[in-house]
Regions:
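Accessory "access/gating" subregions that flank catalytic or transport cores
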Residues: 70-133, 217-236
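A glycine-rich, basic-preceded beta-loop-alpha segment at the flavin cofactor/substrate interface
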Residues: 1-17, 37-62, 221-232
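Alpha-helix capping/hinge segments and adjacent helical runs
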Residues: 87, 104, 108-186, 289-317, ...
C-alpha cells in the first residue's frame, strides 16, 4: 500500500471484521435459540390455565404463553439479524461487480450499515441467549446443557473490533454525514422500496404504515441531532450516540422483517406443502412479534434523543461516589 495510508487501510479491514463479529453473534444466538426450542418441546411442567383437572398430564412448557414469548423474541432477533447481515453481503457482492456511481452507492450502503450489522446482533444476541437460558431455568446454568457456554461466548461481541459506544459514534458522527448525507439517503430509498412493495398486500399495509412512521421519526431525530452538533458542539451531539444506534438498529431490523413477510406471503399463495407452510407462517409470526413488541421501543428512544439535557456530559465525577 501507499505510505501514510495505513490507518485508512486498517479501517477497510475493520469494516469486514465488524460484520464478521455481528455474524458470529447471530450464529451463537441461533444455536441458543434451537437449544432452548428443543428443551421447551421436551420439558413437561404445569398445565393449561384453562385445565381444571389436577390429575391431567403436564404439558410441554412450549405450550405456555410466556415461553412462546421468549422463543418468539429469540426467533425475531436471530432471523432479523441474519437477514440484515445477508443484506450487507448482497451489497458487498454488488460493490465488487459494479463500477462508477453504482459501485460507490453500494459501498456507501455497506459503510452505513456496518456499525448496525456489528452491534444489533451482538447486543441483542446477549438478550436472546439470556432468554434461552431463562427457558431452561436452573438447567440453563449447568454444563450438561449448552446455554451457559453460549451466554458467556456471546458477551464478547459488543466489545471486540470496536465497542458499541464506538459504533454509535461512527454511525451518527461519521456515517450519517458521509458524502453530505448521501449514504443515509440511499438507505432510506432501500427501506421505502420495501414499504411500497408491502403496501400492495392488504394484510401487510398496516405494518408498512408503521415502518413509514418509524422512518419519519428516524429523519426527525437525525436532523435534530445534526442541529445539536451545530449549536451545542460534538460532546452534546455524540453523548447519546449509542442510543441513536439502538434506535436506528430497531428500524433496520423492522425493514428486514417487512421484506421477509412480503416474501412469505407470496410463497404461501403458491400453496406449498405442510413443512414449507409452517416455515412461512413462522416467519409471519416472528414478523408480527417484532412489529408488536420491538418496534414500539423506538418511541422511548425517540423521546430521549429529541430531549437530551446533557446530563451525561455535565455529570461530575465526584457525584458517583457513595
Amino acid at each position: 500500500g501507499e505510505a501514510n495510508r495505513g490507518l485508512g487501510y486498517m479501517f477497510q479491514m475493520m469494516n469486514g471484521a465488524r460484520i464478521d463479529v455481528g455474524l458470529g453473534a447471530a450464529c451463537i444466538s441461533s444455536a441458543a435459540y434451537y437449544a432452548s426450542l428443543e428443551y421447551a418441546k421436551e420439558r413437561p411442567q404445569g398445565r393449561k390455565l384453562t385445565s381444571k383437572d389436577p390429575l391431567s398430564p403436564q404439558i410441554p412448557i412450549i405450550e405456555h404463553a410466556d415461553i412462546r414469548r421468549m422463543l418468539l423474541f429469540q426467533k425475531a432477533v436471530v432471523e432479523g439479524s441474519l437477514a440484515l447481515l445477508f443484506q450487507c453481503g448482497i451489497y458487498e457482492d454488488l460493490e465488487h461487480v459494479t463500477e462508477g456511481e453504482e459501485h460507490e452507492n453500494y459501498n456507501l450502503l455497506l459503510e452505513l450499515l456496518t456499525p448496525v450489522a456489528k452491534t444489533y446482533p451482538s447486543e441483542m444476541g446477549i438478550l436472546s441467549c439470556s432468554q434461552g437460558l431463562q427457558i431452561l431455568g436452573g438447567y440453563g446454568f449447568c454444563e450438561e446443557f449448552p446455554l451457559e457456554q453460549l451466554y458467556r461466548d456471546v458477551r464478547i461481541h459488543p466489545i471486540h473490533e470496536g465497542t458499541t459506544g464506538i459504533q454509535g459514534m461512527d454511525l451518527l458522527g461519521r456515517k450519517m454525514m458521509m458524502k453530505k448525507g448521501k449514504a443515509a439517503q440511499l438507505y432510506l430509498v432501500e427501506v421505502r422500496k420495501a414499504i411500497k412493495e408491502a403496501e400492495a398486500d392488504a394484510e401487510l399495509k398496516p405494518f408498512a404504515d408503521k415502518l413509514t412512521v418509524a422512518v419519519a421519526q428516524l429523519e426527525k431525530v437525525t436532523l435534530h441531532q445534526f442541529d445539536v452538533a451545530a449549536k451545542q458542539g460534538p460532546e452534546m451531539f455524540l453523548a447519546d450516540a449509542t442510543l441513536y444506534l439502538e434506535f436506528f438498529g430497531i428500524i433496520a431490523i423492522a425493514w428486514q422483517w417487512l421484506r421477509q413477510a412480503t416474501a412469505a406471503k407470496k410463497a404461501l399463495q403458491k400453496n406449498p406443502g405442510e413443512a414449507d407452510t409452517n416455515f412461512y407462517q413462522g416467519k409471519l409470526a416472528a414478523f408480527r412479534y417484532f412489529f408488536g413488541y420491538e418496534l414500539p421501543k423506538i418511541e422511548g428512544l425517540s423521546h430521549r434523543l429529541l430531549n437530551g439535557d446533557g446530563l451525561t456530559v455535565t455529570m461530575k465525577n465526584e457525584y458517583f461516589e457513595d
